[in-house]
Regions:
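A short, acidic, flexible beta-alpha connecting loop/helix-capping segment that sits on the rim
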Residues: 155-160
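A short acidic/glycine-rich loop-to-helix N-cap element
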Residues: 44-47, 161-166
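Gram-negative (and chloroplast) outer-membrane scaffold detector with strong preference
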Residues: 52-125, 132-135, 143-148, 153-154, ...
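Surface-exposed strand-loop-strand hairpins of Gram-negative outer-membrane beta-barrel proteins
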Residues: 38-55, 130-131
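Cleavable N-terminal export/targeting peptides
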Residues: 1-28
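Transmembrane beta-strand segments of Gram-negative outer membrane beta-barrel proteins
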Residues: 26-39, 111
Length: 177
């Protein structure tokens, strides 16, 4: 548990350092919404089928001199139970660092990764929710349009739950204003 707190604290400090870049005036803040399919894997994939997710995001882009931005995502996932098993709902709040590859004009590929809080609950009477820490990593691309942009990304999420970790892969399509 202490190791997770140290890793989380280091992540937050790195994000704060990235946001205090002297070229902060070149940064852009965006609000966005997204949705897509969620593919459960591992033990979670044994119990549930492909589901869906919706996501809200607040993004601060990197600058020309430091192409590292920060993004806070809130996401809801619904995974259908297999056979007669219950559906599983996963709420997340993640802080992520985003490295945008330089040189992109209308299309900018990026790498994203971070950590956050995951609340998981089976949709059945008497089930208790579980609050856990998790991490995520993925790749995506941002597509600049007039006055807004769209994005597509795929990420791997690992939730450190007890007794087994839960993994899922959301494929996301969204819009940023």
């Amino acid at each position: 548990m202490m190791k997770r707190m140290v890793v989380g604290s280091a992540f937050v400090l790195a994000a704060i350092g990235a946001l205090s870049d002297s070229a902060q005036a070149q940064r852009r803040t965006s609000v966005g919404f997204a949705a897509g399919a969620t593919f459960p894997v591992g033990d979670l994939g044994d119990a549930t089928s492909t589901g869906f997710h919706i996501l809200g995001t607040l993004a601060v882009s990197g600058s020309a001199s430091l192409p590292i931005g920060f993004r806070v995502d809130g996401m809801y996932n619904n995974l259908s139970g297999k056979s007669s098993g219950p559906d599983v709902n996963v709420w997340t709040i993640n802080g992520n660092l985003v490295y945008a590859f330089p040189g992109g004009t209308s299309v900018t590929p990026y790498i994203i990764g971070g950590a956050g809080w995951y609340n998981t609950k089976a949709d059945e009477s008497g089930a208790e929710s579980s609050n856990d820490i998790g991490i995520n990593v993925g790749v995506g691309a941002r597509f600049a349009l007039s006055g807004l942009s769209t994005f597509a990304e795929i990420r791997f999420h690992n939730v450190f739950s007890d007794p087994n970790s839960a993994q899922m892969i959301p494929l996301t399509f969204g819009i940023l204003f």
